[in-house]
């Protein structure tokens, strides 16, 4: 009986409510991630049980089940080809910036708990009518697009008040937005690229509103051109317009920053995506930059 009572006391002691700083990671394929799990160093291969992750099921516009998911633990397999039906997660053979980001942000906040929410889809754009689309006032087809799938992801993630499974409700405090996107807008047309700044401002304002924190830190990843186009070397003819829009955004927003380490990255033969090592570098840089912004930008708990 004494042993049973002791065990019950231990379980009760450990099952306490936890406060988590929550980071949202979104964008298109270079946030989705083409890093290959087989390339990972040993310390990234093991699950990091202290960092919960909710990844919304990525689907195209008009499709159902976007944003389905469940809280999991950080590990390889949240890159491209990840799938969730809301009951089980099917991890893939790929990872994205979330992996090293989660490891690094946890190191930068050793006295706090961190959690990640991710929703991203390759080829998606902010410009209206371009590919799979984030434009909030979407009117094509049934009107469902990437913005809706993002909202579903948040709704599903925050619906679970016990994200670590210890039986106690947790407090989730939005702490930052990490956004790696813009290639599709830079590739589509000059008109779409020239509207990127306005579209980016609108989208980040909506993200902040959805997370109920108007001054939430935002870190952007700079898009870069591989130079692999056979005609003129430019994969994105209007890339400079989107790059300038990214610079303008962070100059005009005191709670935003741009990570430009991508300028040194090596692209895969497809001309769009990065190497496994570069995804690890990108995630770490995202973590370093968002941590710097957090001290100067107020955050509020999600209620």
Predicted segments — roles?
Residues 1-7:
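Sec-dependent signal peptide recognition
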Residues 18-302:
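Cell-envelope and extracellular/periplasmic
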Residues 4, 17-18:
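Short hydrophobic "helix-edge" motifs at membrane interfaces and signal-peptide entry regions
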Residues 12-15:
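N-terminal signal peptide c-region/cleavage motif recognized by signal peptidases
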